[in-house]
Curated annotation (Swiss-Prot):
Lineage: Viruses, Varidnaviria, Bamfordvirae, Nucleocytoviricota, Pokkesviricetes
Family: Belongs to the orthopoxvirus OPG165 family.
Superkingdom to which the source organism belongs: Viruses
Keywords: Early protein
The name this protein goes by in its record: Protein OPG165
Induction: Expressed in the early phase of the viral replicative cycle.
InterPro entries the UniProt entry points to: Vaccinia_virus_A37 (IPR009641)
Length: 263
């Protein structure tokens, strides 16, 4: 998420400037922040009760501990400027200038460092953001997650399963990534099969290297996957808006082999 401006926070800035507090609770301040984030995200964002004020002095660093919730950081004041480094632990690191009256949303489990060239005051609050919620589910002898940081993706029994719908939520296709290529899942005589195809949309399989036997792959294609747990994210394909739900799966090889043998 890039830095974005926040408006109408002068009441918050004045309160922090005139009160020497590290933590506080203020429902009005929470509403001001949540309204700004809701406008930016176009979804309902819920903040935790406690607002945390952090002061970063000259050439100091503020380290954010990775958390299962999202974190919203607002730059309240800064003398000399500051930058923020965000690392989601999957070779995706961003270093951004962090101006006053701007905010940034840190995704769950991401690392973050604020570096100040002069005295800087930031406001930190945890938030539940539907599109960024972490999902973990174990069903059909498969561990499903929606964030690679939650899974050991080095085993070769890992795959990606995704559902694509149109803007009106009408089903377009299901796709699976296994054996280092994408397949579309098609139905023949009430059974589903993987057919090699291009990936529809913007999904990346950059960090997945899998090797799954054909019988197992077909078995996985015929399972019910917990897409109802995953937020639908807007994507674009050939300039056409689509929605994507994506899960990473890791197969329990022992139980899966038993399940396949009795199919």
């Amino acid at each position: 998420m890039e830095i974005f401006p926040v408006f109408g926070i002068s009441k918050i800035s004045n309160f922090i400037a005139n009160n020497d507090c590290r933590y506080y609770i203020d429902t009005e301040h929470q509403k001001i922040i949540s309204d700004e984030i809701n406008r930016q995200m176009d979804e309902t964002v819920l903040l935790t009760n406690i607002l945390s004020v952090e002061v970063v002095n000259d050439n100091e660093m503020y380290h954010l501990i990775p958390h299962r919730l999202s974190t919203i950081i607002l730059c309240i004041s800064s003398v000399g400027g500051c930058v923020i480094s965000i690392d989601n632990d999957i070779n995706d690191k961003n270093i951004l200038t962090f101006p006053i009256d701007h905010a940034v949303i840190i995704s769950p489990l991401s690392k973050c460092v604020v570096v100040s060239k002069g005295p800087t005051t930031i406001l930190v609050v945890k938030a539940d953001i539907p599109s960024k919620r972490l999902v973990t589910s174990f069903t059909n002898d498969i561990l499903y997650v929606n964030n690679l940081s939650l899974i050991n993706y080095l085993p070769l029994s890992v795959f990606i399963i995704r559902r694509v719908t149109d803007y009106l939520d009408r089903h377009i296709c299901d796709q699976i990534f296994a054996n280092n290529k994408w397949y579309s899942i098609i139905t023949i005589d009430d059974k589903q099969y993987p057919i090699p195809s291009n990936c529809i949309g913007m999904s990346s399989a950059k960090y997945i290297n899998s090797s799954i036997e054909q019988d197992t792959l077909i078995h996985v294609c015929n399972l019910e996957h917990p897409f109802d747990l995953v937020y639908k994210k807007m994507q674009s394909y050939n300039s056409v808006p689509i929605k994507e739900q994506i899960l990473y799966g890791r197969i329990d090889n022992i139980n899966m082999s038993i399940s396949i043998s009795v199919d």
